[in-house]
């Protein structure tokens, strides 16, 4: 029979004999879940029993106290007494009480571990945290390991900063399982470390430990090793990786890893690696790959051979926007650059020299720099292309000279070893005469150019040369120098650079320079997360709005792609509370960067902000959506942006149109039926005389983005192979968003363009063979959009025929007579029935078409594949349907996972001839390569003459 009151048992606690008290406690423990409210009145007596050192069953008293506190909702006290209960508290018991206490214990341990790790990495060896709390934490992990829940154990150990537990768990796992299972577990650990661990030091320790485990495996997973190298940005580990590959004598895989590093590693890592490998006598072909030259050459070749440029659309924009106005001339220059980006095709400029001649001052600077966008990645011919416009040439305009230096940087962005010295010499030669108008324009272009060329290289000489320009305190050259310094030191977090730039930002009287330094500081702190917090706090607390503006972008870059909650809260607070419109706009834009990986949540988060009374906040919302959802075609983002394209404020419409183009880049009408209407809207804005200039600018640039790179590039912010953010793409978007103040910075978006192709190359000689792959999709699902077609001609206006007055009167009388008689009833009924029938047929046809279209959009898979040529356009949405043909001559050196980029192939029939694709570099190479070896048959019968 169950007890209805605990009074008799509680009375026994006042007895003198310990055995009676023990009996009472054990009995109370059985009913505490039902009668806890009554027992809570005697809680002081139960606690007193626990505090009595002479009492033999103190642990039972602690357990009861814990259960009472648990039911009262006081979890900290409940955990305290549960820990004191020692073995009486059974963590294996299946009850809500035990689950809650264990959960709260782990939470408390994690909080303490987080605090202690920053002070001492070996905190767990020194009993700094309550040993009882540590005991529950460790017992829980043991329980997980016994139940073969290794992933759960690793997750808990990661949260508790216990590298020792992770190491021992992995060691035992690696000894038991196969290599493939072990690689899966380490990949899981890496994903957790990269996406959830907030402490940079601890994350680095995990990655290094994972690298050691992978290197000691019998069959190395080089893709995972490469992922660790890129995330740590450590050239030393990269050297170890290539050393192991050399020992295994796998040239094909070495080449593939080198190509992967070129697409994802920093310029600093690549330069150190090339220097070290050269000193150690590595294969020149491998060193050539690491220089970036082959990758850029392949991409230029793909973009040139497959260009699908809508010249008609560009010409329509040019003719609709008067080139006399620098705003419109700049818009067309930027759009032209984007549409031809990387194709090395400057035919539009050559065909429109009179239009080009209309450019004045900075519009001339932007137009010249657009050549750099067109020839992006043309590392071999870049300087030759820009030679007619560079200082020392016959070019008379200072804006052309400055623009050419900026363009040179755009060509060599991230691969600037061959041009850095040239640009540095120009800066050094001219920095002494800074302040002169001609020299300032030159230094402006050179500073931006060298920032691009030396991006992420941490080159001290470049930094010092730019600092010299900055300290001359000229608004024009100083702003560009500040941005160049940030680009050069990208992601390094160098304390001296941060100190120099922050101090000078408070001293200078030029707003342009302060803003340049603020954005430069953000660039230096790229990817540094909590290590940038002190600087962020200082910047956001500043009275100078331009520094607060930079503070928002510092959060954006320091926490890019992390989805960090505290960063999001901070930005939302600034977005709704700051007194300055520019700062509020920057804070909303920054949300897009922080939530890059969680892009599906962005429309929901910014939806209310898109309806803000403040136009700058609405503008920031548009950019945030464009950045976070770039290249994704996300419908919920389009739904938020659509009303903003009709906003009453011109710059909000501008931002909305640009954001839509970034989201819908490489989308066709078949992938998204809204694309056609959006393109029509862009064109109608450009051609409408009543639209404001800023809206027209936005529509023109948006057209350029939608058709970028000859319709063969997308904006890809994450590297699928390594799981890291694409640094160039992120930097390109940050700098592009600064075009609000300075239109020439719009060219930076070209850094974010990634060619949409799979380029299969032969590992033995890096040649591109002609072969085909399978695509298991409907053949026309991913075809190019239709080209713009202007209406064939206007209808000829009909001229009224002269009519005599007598004829007119006769016609009027006849009409009146007919009206009086009225139509035949049967005729009326017949006519009505025919109209109804026609309407029903139309409705049915429209419905069927719509259903067919929807079915097509949803299901693109086809069981019967069609063939796709090597080095042709393969959209990101299409790549999942691509596979190499089974038992084909060319097979990838590692498993193909549907990612775009360079794929190294193993040739199964190396002695057989094969047709090759000629690259841009080979087309212009006067020293033709040796022909493929061939046999001459001695017994050849030549026909007689």
From Swiss-Prot:
Q: What else is known?
A: Present with 4750 molecules/cell in log phase SD medium.
InterPro entries in the record: 26S_Psome_Rpn2, ARM-like, ARM-type_fold, Proteasome/cyclosome_rpt, PSMD1_RPN2_N, RPN2_C
What cellular component GO annotations does this protein have? nucleus; proteasome complex; proteasome regulatory particle, base subcomplex; proteasome storage granule
Q: Which residues carry this modification: N-acetylserine?
A: 2
Instruction: Specify where the region named Disordered lies, as residue ranges.
Output: 810-851
Q: Name the Gene Ontology biological process terms.
A: proteasome assembly; proteasome-mediated ubiquitin-dependent protein catabolic process; regulation of protein catabolic process; ubiquitin-dependent protein catabolic process
What the protein does?
Acts as a regulatory subunit of the 26S proteasome which is involved in the ATP-dependent degradation of ubiquitinated proteins.
Q: Where is the composition biased (Basic residues)?
A: 810-819
Q: List residue spans for each PC repeat.
A: 366-399, 403-440, 445-479, 480-514, 516-549, 550-585, 586-618, 620-654, 655-692, 698-734
Bias (Basic and acidic residues): 820-851
Molecular functions (GO terms): enzyme regulator activity; ubiquitin protein ligase binding
- Give the family, as the similarity comment puts it: Belongs to the proteasome subunit S1 family.
Q: What is this protein called?
A: 26S proteasome regulatory subunit RPN2
- Phosphothreonine modification, residue list: 801, 932
Question: Is Acetylation there in the keyword field?
Answer: yes
């Amino acid at each position: 029979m169950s007890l209805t009151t605990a009074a008799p048992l509680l009375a026994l606690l006042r007895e003198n004999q310990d055995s009676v008290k023990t009996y009472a406690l054990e009995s109370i423990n059985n009913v505490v879940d039902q009668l806890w409210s009554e027992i809570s009145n005697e809680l002081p007596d139960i606690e007193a029993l626990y505090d009595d050192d002479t009492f033999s069953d103190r642990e039972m008293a602690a357990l009861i106290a814990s259960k009472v506190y648990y039911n009262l909702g006081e979890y900290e006290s409940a955990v305290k007494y549960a820990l004191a209960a020692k073995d009486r508290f059974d963590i294996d018991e299946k009850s809500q009480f035990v689950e809650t206490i264990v959960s709260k214990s782990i939470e408390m341990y994690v909080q303490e571990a987080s605090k202690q790790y920053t002070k001492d990495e070996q905190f767990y060896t020194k009993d700094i945290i309550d040993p009882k709390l540590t005991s529950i934490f460790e017992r829980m992990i043991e329980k997980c390991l016994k139940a073969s829940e290794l992933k759960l154990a690793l997750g808990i150990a990661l949260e508790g900063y216990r590298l020792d537990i992770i190491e021992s768990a992995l060691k035992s796992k690696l000894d038991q399982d196969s290599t493939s299972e072990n690689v899966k577990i380490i990949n899981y650990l890496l994903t957790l470390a990269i996406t959830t661990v907030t402490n940079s030091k601890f994350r680095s320790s995990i990655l290094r430990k994972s690298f050691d485990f992978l290197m000691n495996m019998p069959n190395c997973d080089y893709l995972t090793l490469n992922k660790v190298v890129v995330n740590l940005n450590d050239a030393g580990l990269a050297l170890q990786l290539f050393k192991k590959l050399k020992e295994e004598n796998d040239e094909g895989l070495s080449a593939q890893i080198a190509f992967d590093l070129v697409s994802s590693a920093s310029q600093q890592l690549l330069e150190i690696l090339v220097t070290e490998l050269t000193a150690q006598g590595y294969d020149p072909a491998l060193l050539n790959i690491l220089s970036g030259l082959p990758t850029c050459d392949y991409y230029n070749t793909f973009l040139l051979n497959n260009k699908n440029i809508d010249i008609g659309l560009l010409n329509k924009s040019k003719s609709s926007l008067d080139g006399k106005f620098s705003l419109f001339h700049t818009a067309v220059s930027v759009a032209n650059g984007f549409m031809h980006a990387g194709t090395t095709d400057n035919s539009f400029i050559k065909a429109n020299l009179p239009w080009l001649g209309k450019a004045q001052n900075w519009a001339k600077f932007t137009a010249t720099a657009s050549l750099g966008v067109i020839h992006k990645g043309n590392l071999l011919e870049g300087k030759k292309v820009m030679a007619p416009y560079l200082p020392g040439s016959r070019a008379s305009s200072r804006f052309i000279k400055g623009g050419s230096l900026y363009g040179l940087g755009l060509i060599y962005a991230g691969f600037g070893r061959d041009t850095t010295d040239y640009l540095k010499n120009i800066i050094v030669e001219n920095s002494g005469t800074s302040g002169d108008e001609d020299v300032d324009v030159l230094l402006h272009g050179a500073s931006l150019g060298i920032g691009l060329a030396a991006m992420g290289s941490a080159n001290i000489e470049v930094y010092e040369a730019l600092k010299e320009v900055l300290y001359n305190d000229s608004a024009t050259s100083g702003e560009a120098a500040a941005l160049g310094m940030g680009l050069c030191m990208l992601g390094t977090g160098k304390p001296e650079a941060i100190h120099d730039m922050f101090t000078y930002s408070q001293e200078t009287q030029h707003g342009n320079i302060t803003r340049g330094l603020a954005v430069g500081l953000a660039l230096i702190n790229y990817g540094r997360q909590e290590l940038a917090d002190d600087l962020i706090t200082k910047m956001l607390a500043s009275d100078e709005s331009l520094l607060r503006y930079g503070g928002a972008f510092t959060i954006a870059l320091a926490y890019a792609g992390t989805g960090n909650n505290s960063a999001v809260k901070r930005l939302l607070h600034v977005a709704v509370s700051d007194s300055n419109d520019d700062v509020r706009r920057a804070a909303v834009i920054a949300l897009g960067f922080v939530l890059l990986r969680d892009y599906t949540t962005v429309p929901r988060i910014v939806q209310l902000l898109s309806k803000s009374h403040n136009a700058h906040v609405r503008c920031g919302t548009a950019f945030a959506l464009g950045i976070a959802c770039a290249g994704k075609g996300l419908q919920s983002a389009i739904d938020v942006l659509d009303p903003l394209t009709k906003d009453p404020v011109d710059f909000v419409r501008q931002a909305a149109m640009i954001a839509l183009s970034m989201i819908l880049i490489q989308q066709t009408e078949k992938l998204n039926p809204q694309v056609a209407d959006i393109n029509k809207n862009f064109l109608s804005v450009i051609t409408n005389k009543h639209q404001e200039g800023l809206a027209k600018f936005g529509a023109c640039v948006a057209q350029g983005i939608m058709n970028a790179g000859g319709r063969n590039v997308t904006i890809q912010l994450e590297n699928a192979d390594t799981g890291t953010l694409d640094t160039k793409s992120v930097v390109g978007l940050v700098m592009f968003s600064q075009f609000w103040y300075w239109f020439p910075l719009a060219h930076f978006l070209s850094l974010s363009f990634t060619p949409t192709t799979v380029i299969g190359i032969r590992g033995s000689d890096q040649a591109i063979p002609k072969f085909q792959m399978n695509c298991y999709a409907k053949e026309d699902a991913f075809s190019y959009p239709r080209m713009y077609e202007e209406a064939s001609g206007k209808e000829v206006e009909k001229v009224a025929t002269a009519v005599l007055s007598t004829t007119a009167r006769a016609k009027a009388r006849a009409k009146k007579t007919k009206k009086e008689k009225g139509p035949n009833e049967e005729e009326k009924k017949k006519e009505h029935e025919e109209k109804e029938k026609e309407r029903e047929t139309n409705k049915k046809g429209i419905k069927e078409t719509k259903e067919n279209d929807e079915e097509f959009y949803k299901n693109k898979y086809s069981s019967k594949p069609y063939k796709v040529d090597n080095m042709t356009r393969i959209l990101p949405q299409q790549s999942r349907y691509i596979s190499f043909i089974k038992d084909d001559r060319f097979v990838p050196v590692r498993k193909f996972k549907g990612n775009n980029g360079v794929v190294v192939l193993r040739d199964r029939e190396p002695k057989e001839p094969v047709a090759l694709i000629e690259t841009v570099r080979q087309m212009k190479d006067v020293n033709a390569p040796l022909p493929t070896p061939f046999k001459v048959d001695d017994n050849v019968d030549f026909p007689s003459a």
